[in-house]
């Protein structure tokens, strides 16, 4: 069994325990007794025992405080070597994700059987793609090792940071490595790990079918440049198309014509479906891509409403940056005014994202997804950044990074009733030449806003400070899921995105490299959150729920993306949005900000085992 299969099996089982998949944790017992007839050299090994009419599962587990209470492992710290299944008096050793999926299928409702079969294919794809991407990492080692601060242009720095980020797996979704729908050859041509340029295809669409949100950018081709008669411009509009998406279509709908020639050389970014225009690198174009990632239900097409909702948040956040002293100079937003769509069709749409040169030209833009990426010298990329921008003081960098995230996102939550889905891909840290960090924002089409608090805050600001008229109205939002009727939804998003994805994942990576203990790093995070809550409360803002969720509750909310995105039907999960399906099950690591507290917590879990 190869290393990648073991790696994926570990991630899969840990996620199943974290999300209590099919009751495998809540219906289990824990014991220190090994399966009958099995000799295990590790003393004090804890076994998760799950009884089912068809079998009994014995899974070796260890207690943890990070994202879940138990994970698949051995007490000696070495990688687990499998589990045991007792059937009809016979004990069988297993260790492959295929066997784990077979167990889950036995436990699952019939509505999940097809989903589990599909997920097995995703696992196999992830195993293959990981091997190919690991090869690409070795091949590009010299290129990605060059100091990012020494590159001549901001856009080369961003592309390099995206490429570095692409080699690191998602912290929590087990098969994020799979770009499901891409062949080996497709991966090499179109994935950021390989950093190859390609040309966009174009579709001429009858104007009567098309909606454009503004004028198309200067880099757009003419009809003649893509091999069509010039007078087509009177009746048609050109839409960009990814080669893979165009290839997947059996035929184009009526009113659409594929242009004979390609135009615009582009390079893929971390998201794969968003590409950089090589000759105009401040222009990024997001195009539909027939690819699934972060869940078999997550097809990377473009919902037309996101064009409008993303631009709505761009206008709002840019306005708040200008009018709120706590946000001023701490963030800037890409221009996402332009896009096009054909009715509600998700396959024929695009968004243009323009990076503002006044904010970018003197900076290095780094997605949060790149920070914990391992480099060829076995250090984390964040260590390289600290060396180049923070006089090698990694802890000083971490302090400033946490303070920046907490100040911006807690202000948005508690003052304005806004929570951004600023995941590791969307959250970008911009370093200036002196090392000062700001946040570059984009793609905020799936945020959450509580209109009651938002309206109160903006009206109060206008009365008190004479702030300019608010440029947006909540009634303009198209995706009604964005608007929430209580504060909990904001707290859940802050916890699962900003705190867990953007901060805790970085903490654990730093601790694994012995840069500092996780306890000391969580102490920095807890202190930063406390300072921001005290500041905001001192200004008269309500912090009760935030304190309950972050400073008092023993468990934090966690996102259950494997459940909602891949293994449970919508009827079973009840999730209206697969990216916002939560469980209250992650230990609150903010309360474990000393090594003594961590040890006591783990010992308490062990003592609960009979």
Where do the language-model regions lie?
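Nucleotide/phosphate-binding site architecture used for ATP/NTP-dependent chemistry
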Residues: 1-404, 431-610
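Short amphipathic alpha-helical surface micro-motifs
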Residues: 266-270, 410-411, 420-423
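An amphipathic, hydrophobic-aromatic interaction surface with interspersed Lys/Arg
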Residues: 402-415
């Amino acid at each position: 069994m190869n290393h990648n299969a073991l790696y994926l099996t570990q991630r899969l089982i840990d996620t199943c325990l974290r999300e209590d998949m099919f009751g495998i944790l809540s219906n289990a017992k824990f014991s220190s007794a090994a399966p009958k007839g099995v000799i295990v050299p590790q003393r004090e090994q804890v076994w998760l025992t799950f009884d089912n009419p068809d079998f009994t599962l014995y899974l070796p587990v260890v207690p943890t405080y990070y994202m879940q209470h138990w994970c698949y492992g051995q007490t000696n710290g070495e990688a687990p070597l499998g589990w045991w299944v007792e059937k009809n008096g016979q004990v069988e050793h297993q260790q492959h994700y295929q066997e784990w999926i077979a167990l889950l299928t036995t436990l699952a409702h019939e509505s999940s059987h097809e989903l589990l079969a599909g997920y097995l294919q995703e696992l196999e794809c992830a195993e293959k793609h990981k091997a190919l991407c690991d090869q690409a990492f070795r091949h590009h080692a010299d290129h990605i090792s060059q100091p990012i601060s020494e590159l001549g242009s901001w856009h080369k720095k961003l592309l390099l940071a995206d490429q570095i980020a692409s080699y690191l797996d998602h912290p929590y979704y087990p098969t994020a490595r799979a770009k499901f729908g891409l062949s080996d050859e497709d991966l090499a041509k179109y994935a950021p790990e390989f950093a190859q340029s390609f040309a966009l295809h174009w579709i001429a669409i009858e104007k009567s079918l098309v909606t454009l949100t503004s004028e198309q950018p200067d880099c757009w081709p003419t009809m003649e440049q893509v091999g069509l008669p010039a007078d087509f411009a009177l009746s048609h509009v050109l839409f960009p198309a990814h080669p893979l998406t165009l290839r997947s279509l059996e035929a184009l709908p009526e009113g659409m014509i594929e242009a004979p020639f390609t135009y615009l050389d582009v390079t893929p970014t971390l998201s794969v479906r968003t590409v950089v225009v090589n000759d105009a690198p401040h222009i990024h174009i997001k195009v539909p891509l027939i690819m699934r990632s972060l869940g078999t239900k997550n097809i990377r097409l473009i919902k037309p409403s996101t064009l409008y909702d993303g631009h709505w948040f761009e206008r709002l956040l840019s306005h708040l940056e200008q009018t709120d002293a706590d946000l001023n100079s701490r963030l800037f937003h890409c221009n996402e005014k332009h896009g096009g769509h054909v009715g509600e069709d998700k396959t024929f749409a695009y968004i243009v994202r323009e990076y503002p040169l006044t904010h970018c030209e003197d900076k290095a833009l780094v997605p949060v997804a790149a920070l914990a990426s391992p480099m060829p010298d076995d250090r984390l990329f964040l260590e390289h950044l600290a060396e180049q921008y923070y006089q090698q003081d990694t802890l000083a960098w971490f302090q400033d990074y946490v303070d920046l995230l907490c100040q911006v996102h807690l202000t948005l939550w508690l003052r304005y009733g806004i929570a951004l889905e600023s995941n590791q891909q969307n959250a970008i840290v911009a370093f200036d030449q002196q090392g000062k960090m700001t946040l570059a924002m984009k793609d905020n089409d799936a945020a959450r806003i509580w209109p009651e608090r938002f309206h109160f805050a903006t009206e109060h600001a206008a009365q008190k400070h004479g702030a300019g008229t608010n440029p947006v109205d909540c009634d303009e939002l198209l995706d009604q899921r964005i608007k929430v009727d209580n504060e909990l939804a904001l707290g859940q998003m802050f916890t699962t995105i900003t705190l867990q994805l953007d901060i805790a994942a970085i903490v654990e990576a730093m601790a694994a490299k012995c840069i500092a203990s996780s306890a000391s790093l969580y102490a920095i995070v807890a202190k930063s959150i406390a300072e921001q809550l005290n500041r905001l409360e001192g200004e008269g803002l309500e912090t009760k729920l935030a304190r309950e969720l972050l400073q008092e509750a023993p468990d934090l909310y966690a996102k259950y993306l494997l459940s909602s995105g891949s293994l449970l039907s919508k009827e079973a999960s009840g999730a209206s949005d697969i990216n916002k399906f939560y469980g209250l099950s992650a230990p609150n690591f903010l309360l474990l900000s000393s090594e003594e507290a961590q040890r006591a917590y783990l010992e308490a879990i062990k003592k609960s085992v009979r």
